[in-house]
């Protein structure tokens, strides 16, 4: 189509420095949301845009924001430096991600446009120093932005020109309603605003009335998830809870799931139970949760994206169950403490090249399923979603399928063709491993990991800043070992491999390494001449007695 050809990045009137940054990122063409939103934003219109997760919403507001700021500095009257752009996001991780994207797009104009993120867990004094320099764009959560506004370390009433609310449908459910209303009192009467959301609900409608002025609504006609040619979605019915653990063990140990995978569970306790269970079989994983320091969570995501880990267990108590309005959640499902209410996993976080999403626990809402599934099959890459379902959860599964199917009444979640009787030989192993993962073991594992991550996060912060290469050596998937680990469980004998898979799969076996104590002993022995010296003397042969 001619119209679509006329709306490439090079035809949007963008600054050459932005075009160069877009080229460096490897974006040959804008996504649908970018193609529609950027020209309208450059015309000065308020936008209410809905697009599915992974569709490029961040760049859809970041590019016009940078273009408008650069154009103003190049053609407008000379005015003092001030904060002119504000980006509000529901979680610290999303704030860091938004800042990173804006900085990448501003690579060639970094002197003209500066970006600051004030949501990180730093002391307010250091953040105040950053804000005193008056960056052009400030990114943060509503609570942290409001705190700086109340302390007068951030002033927006006379300077703000652009306001962005990203993942708008989550802000109220994360408990930011009061902060948002208070924050708006510190803004000028006139400004351009963008509201970006994956879904349109009552919360988004309320935000629209609070923030937008005669907006253009972009409700793109696209499915909430990629089509079956890109994203394959399966369900597998497990008769018991034990069957779920058994099936997961077989999928991972026999390498039936290839590439990087995300395992979603509904509670923090379940995530550690699953990690300790897999640890019994020498399957390394790491848990991403809100109890860990922000630096540790971001480091885990970064290393996962770089290929350090093949499997991450994720939990996001903030988006499970009914939204809590007007207050922060103190506890998630089954009493899990949400120690960091601004930590989020299932929505918006950019995991790179995820081959498979495994819903070990059925998502509590159809929307949660969409957000989880959106972690794979991004940027035209293929992906698989496999959902484990108990017989008692069939009704809830039907609700998810109803939302996914829409007008197309065909089945979306196809049955996963797997014969459980083929892996019955592994059941006794799984049962043995499940028994050893007690509540006490889970408590000890959580405490141990939090202590270690706090140490890594705080004590080594300055060291890693001076020695960035050593940061790559810091692992988050090392065994916790509060449960009794039986070494033989890490090995899969050939007779246990299902007949249909023999010769096709090779259960990955970890190369045996000498323990540090063995290596030290061997080195000490080789360096000690008294212990390493060997003398081969002539053997004594008795002479024959004369007769």
Swiss-Prot record:
One of its GO terms (cellular component) is cytosol. Keywords: ATP-binding, Helicase, Hydrolase, Nucleotide-binding, Nucleus, Phosphoprotein, Ribosome biogenesis, RNA-binding, rRNA processing. Its EC number is 3.6.4.13. ATP binds at residues 51-58. A motif (DEAD box) lies at residues 166-169. The modification Phosphothreonine is found at residue 141. It is an enzyme of class 3 (hydrolase). InterPro entries: DEAD/DEAH_box_helicase_dom (IPR011545), DEAD_box_RNA_helicase (IPR050079), Helicase_ATP-bd (IPR014001), Helicase_C-like (IPR001650), P-loop_NTPase (IPR027417), RNA_helicase_DEAD_Q_motif (IPR014014). Pfam families: DEAD, Helicase_C. It catalyses: ATP + H2O = ADP + phosphate + H(+). May form homooligomeric complexes. Interacts with IRF3. Interacts with OCT4 and POU5F1. Nucleolar RNA helicase that plays a role in various biological processes including innate immunity, ribosome biogenesis or nucleolus organization. Plays an essential role in maintaining nucleolar integrity in planarian stem cells. Maintains embryonic stem cells proliferation by conventional regulation of ribosome assembly and interaction with OCT4 and POU5F1 complex. Regulates antiviral innate immunity by inhibiting the virus-triggered signaling nuclear translocation of IRF3. Mechanistically, acts by disrupting the interaction between IRF3 and importin IPO5. (Microbial infection) Helicase activity is important for packaging viral RNA into virions during West Nile virus infection. Belongs to the DEAD box helicase family. DDX56/DBP9 subfamily. This is Probable ATP-dependent RNA helicase DDX56. The lineage of its organism: Eukaryota, Metazoa, Chordata, Craniata, Vertebrata.
């Amino acid at each position: 189509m001619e119209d679509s050809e006329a709306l490439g990045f090079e035809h949007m009137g963008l600054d050459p420095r932005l075009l160069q940054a877009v080229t460096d990122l490897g974006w040959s063409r804008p996504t649908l949301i970018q193609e529609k939103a950027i020209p309208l934003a450059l015309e000065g219109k308020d936008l209410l845009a809905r697009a599915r997760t992974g569709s490029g919403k961040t760049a859809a507001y970041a590019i016009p924001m940078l273009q408008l700021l650069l154009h103003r500095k190049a053609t407008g009257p000379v005015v003092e430096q001030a904060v002119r752009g504000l980006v509000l996001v529901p979680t610290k991780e999303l704030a860091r991600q938004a800042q990173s994207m804006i900085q990448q797009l501003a690579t060639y104009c970094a002197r003209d446009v500066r970006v600051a993120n004030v949501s990180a867990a730093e002391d307010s004094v250091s953040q105040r120093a950053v804000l005193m320099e008056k960056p052009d764009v400030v990114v943060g959560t509503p609570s942290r932005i409001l705190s700086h506004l109340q302390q007068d370390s951030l002033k927006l009433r006379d300077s703000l020109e652009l306001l962005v609310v990203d993942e708008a449908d989550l802000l109220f459910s994360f408990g930011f309603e009061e902060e948002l209303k208070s924050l708006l009192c510190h803004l000028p009467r006139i400004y351009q605003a963008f509201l970006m959301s994956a879904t349109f609900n009552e919360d988004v409608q309320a935000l629209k009335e609070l923030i937008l002025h005669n907006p253009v609504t972009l409700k793109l006609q696209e499915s909430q998830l990629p089509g079956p040619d890109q994203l394959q979605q399966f369900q597998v019915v497990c008769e018991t809870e034990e069957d779920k653990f058994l099936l997961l063990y077989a999928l991972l140990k026999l390498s039936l799931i290839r590439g990087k995978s995300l395992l979603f569970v509904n509670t923090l306790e379940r995530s550690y139970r699953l990690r300790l269970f897999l640890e019994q079989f020498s399957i390394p994983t790491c848990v991403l949760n809100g109890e860990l320091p922000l630096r540790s969570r971001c480091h885990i995501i970064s290393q996962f994206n770089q290929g350090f880990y093949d499997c991450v267990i994720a939990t996001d108590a903030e988006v499970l169950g009914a939204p809590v309005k007007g207050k922060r959640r103190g506890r998630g499902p089954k009493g899990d403490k949400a120690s960091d209410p601004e930590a989020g996993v299932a929505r918006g976080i950019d995991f790179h090249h995820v081959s498979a999403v495994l819903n070990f626990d059925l998502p509590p809402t159809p929307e949660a399923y969409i957000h989880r599934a959106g972690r794979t099959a991004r940027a035209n890459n293929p992906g698989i979603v496999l959902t484990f379902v108990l017989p008692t959860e069939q009704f809830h599964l039907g609700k998810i399928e109803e939302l996914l199917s829409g007008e197309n009444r065909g089945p979306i979640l196809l049955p996963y063709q797997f014969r459980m009787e083929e892996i019955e030989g592994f059941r006794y192993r799984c049962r043995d491993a499940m028994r050893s993962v007690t509540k006490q073991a889970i408590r000890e594992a959580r405490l141990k990991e939090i202590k270690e991550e706090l140490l890594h996060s705080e004590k080594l912060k300055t060291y890693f800043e001076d020695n960035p290469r050593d940061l790559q050596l810091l692992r988050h998937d090392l065994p916790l070992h509060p449960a009794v680990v039986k070494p033989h469980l890490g090995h899969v004998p050939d007779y246990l491999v299902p007949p249909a898979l023999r010769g096709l799969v090779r259960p990955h076996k970890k190369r045996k390494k000498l323990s540090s104590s063995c290596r030290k002993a061997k080195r000490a022995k080789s360096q000690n001449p008294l212990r390493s010296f060997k003398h081969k003397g002539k053997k004594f042969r008795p002479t024959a007695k004369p007769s």
